[in-house]
Amino acid sequence: FSIVEYIYIMSITRQNLSVIIVSYRSDHVIKNCIDSIGSEIEIVVIDNSNNFEFKKKIEFEYKNVKCILSKKNLGMGAGNNLGIKNVNKDFALILNPDVTLENNCVDEMITASKEIENFAVIAPISSKDKYPNYILDKGHNFDPVKPFKVKSVDGYAMLLNLKKLKKINDFNFFDENFFLYLEN
């Protein structure tokens, strides 16, 4: 890795990060998700419907939200790909609409990105009491505040280095052949 890449990695901020949320009839949970992100980060909601009232309401309530209606239910993979095509930032945080970020989760992922040379994907640990997948995979002897490698990440929350991934896959990061589950 070169000095230029190192400087680039160090430059991730809330300003060059977009959040992408794919929604389908998620009106009852998506507001908690958006509220947990913060108002200074651009959020792109891909609503897998043609619900213009939802679009109008969410964009009025949240000035940092852009809602794109897909007109039909594309599924998670195609919805996330549509979101990625509609952001003009170097990094994207993919979130499911029922995710509520705790405390400084975004800032912690940004900090972790600075510790990992040339990362492609970073994911937070979900509530270890509810979802012990990473702990079981890694074992019990790890520091949960330090980044560590895993075989895979869950798609509910993933920080993507778009600049790096675009070189690899030219915008189709998610397999659109899978409508829901296993698309990531």
Question: Can you say where each PLM-predicted feature lies in the sequence?
Answer:
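A conserved acidic beta->alpha catalytic loop
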Residues: 36, 47-55
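Short beta-strand/loop segment that forms part of the nucleotide-sugar
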Residues: 41-50, 68-70
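Conserved donor NDP-sugar-binding/catalytic core segment of glycosyltransferases
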Residues: 104-134
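Short, flexible, basic/aromatic active-site loop/helix in glycosyltransferases
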Residues: 132-157
